[in-house]
Amino acid sequence: GIYRDPGHLGTAHPFLALTAVLERVTPGQYVALPAFGSGADAILLRTTPALQAWQAKRRLAAQAERARPLPTYGHFLSFRRLVDGEKIEPYSSLMLAWREQESNLRRKAHRCQACGQIHFPPHNVCPKCQSRAEFAKVRLSDRGTIVTFTCDRLAPSPDAPVIMVVVDLDGGGRMFTQLVDAKPDEVAIGKRVEFVFRRFHEGGGAVNYFWKFRLERRG
């Protein structure tokens, strides 16, 4: 069940519980979403026929199957910050996060109007034809193919090694970022991956999120 498997997830938990309920109800039913903390509130929702199309997509059970058990108790302690590890000091700021939200959160890239090249992160000069022509904003595809990768055993991480991948995205564009939920022996050039939105680091006094990849799984 939702309380037995992931445990209580804090702020996100009511919405996860709502998702679990919406997987079982039918159009036209009422669903109450209560939440408590410093006070309490509740939202009353009514399902519509659009629910059935949503239910045909990925379900919570399929998402739970992606979970990878931690190899050792030491990994658990490290993730919970109960043991000291190598310190990292990431930098960020709310101003920077706001200014770059289109690329960092919405995955908006630039398409060169002169040669059609898609590049991410966006630049004011096309890296292919060096044109300074107008650029169109396009959203990067959800999936792509690994071009090359590396397993970094020196970068500070509670779950070493850190797997970094270069991915050619469907429809154009290339991105370099971290691969998660995978072991080094599961990664290979040519494997298909998909984007996931994950916690990145704590910098500038705030939690920062960014896009990472995981191995593609259908269904």
Predicted features, each with a name:
Residues 88-145:
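Cys/His-rich short segments
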Residues 33, 195-196:
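A generic structural signal for residues embedded in beta-strands
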